[in-house]
Amino acid sequence: MYAKSSEKNDGSIGMDKNITVATMQFKEDVKVSSVEYLKTYYTFNIGDIAFEGHQSKDFRYGRFVENDIGNGIVSHIFAVFRPIQEYDLHFWKYAINNEMLMQRILSRSTKASTMMHDLVTNDFLNETFLVPSLDEQKHIGAFFDNLDHLITLHQRKLEKLKILKKACLEKMFV
């Protein structure tokens, strides 16, 4: 599915396109020593994945994060992988963050180091797992995107109701 990417920034991509892997957002306020230092950063295109090795309660061995926000650059400390087969971006965003799927793979392709896990690239690339057809990936990805959209809408509605409740309580007990 993926191949390791070692494509470096040729200097044409500035800090305005720096992507923080932890939150998958563009982060412009990072300080770099020079424009030359930006050439040590990897290019990180839509559909690429990067490994973040921090252990958490949700991700025992670290996690992969898929770039779904736009082409940019990431620090050279992250392993970046580029897709080599056609696949559905939305499906893989959910699949690579599914601990049930990835735990077995990452337990065999990472090694513990100080405060985090390091990915052993060759071990990861030698892992295999069953993948749905492209058509199934599209349906599954769309389903979860729709579900996320519904959750967001209900969260907004809940916030508005909380504000309304607070206002009513304030007026009632004046």
Regions inferred by a protein language model and the residue ranges of each:
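Feature detects amphipathic, helix-rich regulatory segments
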Residues: M1-V174
